[in-house]
Each structure stands twice: as C-alpha cells, then as structure tokens.
Amino acid sequence: MTRIISGEAQQGEQIPGASDRALRPQTLAEFVGQEQAKANLRIFIEAAKGRGEALDHVLLFGPPGLGKTTLAQIVARELGVNFRATSGPVLNKAGDLAAILTNLEANDVLFIDEIHRLPSTVEEILYPAMEDHVLDLVIGEGPSARSIRIDLAPFTLVAATTRAGMLATPLRDRFGIPIRLEFYTPKELQHVLLGAARKMGAPLNEDGAAEIAARARGTPRVAGRLLRRVRDFASADGASVIDRKAAGMALARLEVDELGLDSLDRRYLRALIENYGGGPAGVETLAYAIAEARDAVEDVIEPYLMQQGFIQRTPRGRMACGKAYLHLGLTEPVSAPKAVQGGLFGED
C-alpha cells in the first residue's frame, strides 16, 4: 500500500540519489529536532573519542520516517570512522553477517536497519560479537563439524527498529545506548522544510512551510515527500512563491486534509460511522468494508487515527470518537466516546 503520507520508506527512497543525500544533515548540529537524543549522543560520542574506544552499541527506535538512518550516518561521521550499512531482511545466513563483521576496522560503525527482522540464526552469532568482539562459527556438518572462534575489531552496532517490542530480550539488553525518537512538532518540521527547500531551490516561504508541516504527521520523511509534490504543482501552475495558499491548493489536490488525513483514512472513518453506526466493529469487518488487508488496516491506517483521537480500540472492536464525526461534518451521537488524544508529539 503506497501512500504519500506514510512514514515508511517508499521505492527509490531506501537508496537515495545524490540530490537526496545533499538534503540530509551531515552533523548533529545540522540535525533538526530530537534535542534530548542529540544532547546525549554528543556526550557519548565525545567520551568515546576521548578514550579512543568504540562507542557503546546504539539502538534507535520509534515510528518510521523520523531520521534513524540519517542519525546513524551522523554518528559515524562525528566519530570519524567508517560506516557500513545493511538490514535485517537481507542477512539470511550467519555467513552474511560474518562477512561484514570480519571486514570492519577498529571502532567502525555497522548499521543494521529493521533489526527486528533479523533471523534467529543470524541473531545468535551477533551476541558474542557485540559483547566480546568474537565470532563463533560452526564449520561443516554432522560428526565432522567443528567450531572456530574469530577475533573481531572493536566496533559499534547502531541498529534501527520501528518495533522494539519484537526484539529478543538478550539482544535488546546488549545495547548500552537505547534512544527513542519522537514525532516532530510543526515548528520543527517547518524548520526542516525551509532548509530542504533552500537546498532544492524551491521558492517556499514560512507560511507555505507551516501549511505543509501541519499536514505531515510529525514525520520529516512525509514532510519532504509532500514538499516535492507541492513544488511540482507550483511549478506547473507557474507560482513564483509557494505560500500558504499555493501549498494548501496542492495538498488538497493530493487529498491530504488539514489534519494530515488522506482519502484512505477518511474512507475508513466513513465505513466505521456510516456502515456500522460508529462501532464497535471488528478489524476484519472494517478491512473487508474498505477492501484492504487486515495487516494494512492495523499497521498503516489505525495507528495515526488512534494517536489523534479519531478512534478507540476496545475489547468489542473499533469505535469512532466525536472528533471523527466532527472532522467528517457528521452529527455526533451522544454515545460517541470522547477519546483521550494520544498526542502525535508526545508518548504514543
């Protein structure tokens, strides 16, 4: 399911081109937002450099699109060491990871994205590598099999995940520096957008940036994606500046409303309210009603709607809150629950 307001990386975004790399911050000072995380990282990095040691292993976790990969690259750059990147899904065999680990130089940074998708057989050889800087491998099969131990150079594993709860406890406990990345405030996203627009040569003013930021779901990746499409519309319309009006018109054509909901979000809410009286309705029923897979409904559509107080998940099923009726311009029944908004910019 491809949505312009999805925080997940889309095709072509996983491997950024030269122009995309130019838009990314290169240092902690340039990185906007995540102030507490940056302050702590700066201290840990300086301490490790002062001792001439590898930085302790870092786990970056939180919703997609908040800059985990960029932050991992910055860590390596601030340490002045090499950066190697891979991801959990591509490390199918223990040998795949062993080949990478044995080629690391002292204090290098290895980045593993989506570490929650690492196969258990690969994960097991990571434990001694992280803790003791050794690699324990079994060579051969059956009675002739033998184990060998390979010493590794000290290194820093920086891992990223959107599902920290799926990590095995032994793996999670080996990260000395766990860092949760939070959603961005509209002001922070406005800053990100203005900086990106300058590098892109897009004529975006502060009001235009504020309009895009308000609809970007607290996610820099979404903000950047919206900026590119708004720039396209502005260019096609011959606009000399992307102000609030130009940005609003472009976003309306993209069907992203003032609260960051797209047509799929609104279709879900309408199905819940108009087909099932506002609920409770089961997720399977709702998925069938909007012709989407259950996993897509649970993982892609519902999280933001719950965070923003549009729906509640109850033991009996999903229920529409008063905010959903108001947003769709429908009459709110007395029985509609008043959800406590989880807060996009707080704990989710």
From Swiss-Prot:
GO terms for molecular function: ATP binding; ATP hydrolysis activity; four-way junction DNA binding; four-way junction helicase activity. Residues 1-184 are annotated as: Large ATPase domain (RuvB-L). ATP binds at residues 23-24, 65, 68-70, 174, 184, 221. It holds the Pfam family AAA_lid_4. Its EC number is 3.6.4.-. GO terms for biological process: DNA recombination; DNA repair. Keywords: ATP-binding, Cytoplasm, DNA damage, DNA recombination, DNA repair, DNA-binding, Hydrolase, Nucleotide-binding. Homohexamer. Forms an RuvA(8)-RuvB(12)-Holliday junction (HJ) complex. HJ DNA is sandwiched between 2 RuvA tetramers; dsDNA enters through RuvA and exits via RuvB. An RuvB hexamer assembles on each DNA strand where it exits the tetramer. Each RuvB hexamer is contacted by two RuvA subunits (via domain III) on 2 adjacent RuvB subunits; this complex drives branch migration. In the full resolvosome a probable DNA-RuvA(4)-RuvB(12)-RuvC(2) complex forms which resolves the HJ. NCBIfam families: PRK00080.1 (NF000868), ruvB (TIGR00635). The RuvA-RuvB-RuvC complex processes Holliday junction (HJ) DNA during genetic recombination and DNA repair, while the RuvA-RuvB complex plays an important role in the rescue of blocked DNA replication forks via replication fork reversal (RFR). RuvA specifically binds to HJ cruciform DNA, conferring on it an open structure. The RuvB hexamer acts as an ATP-dependent pump, pulling dsDNA into and through the RuvAB complex. RuvB forms 2 homohexamers on either side of HJ DNA bound by 1 or 2 RuvA tetramers; 4 subunits per hexamer contact DNA at a time. This is Holliday junction branch migration complex subunit RuvB.
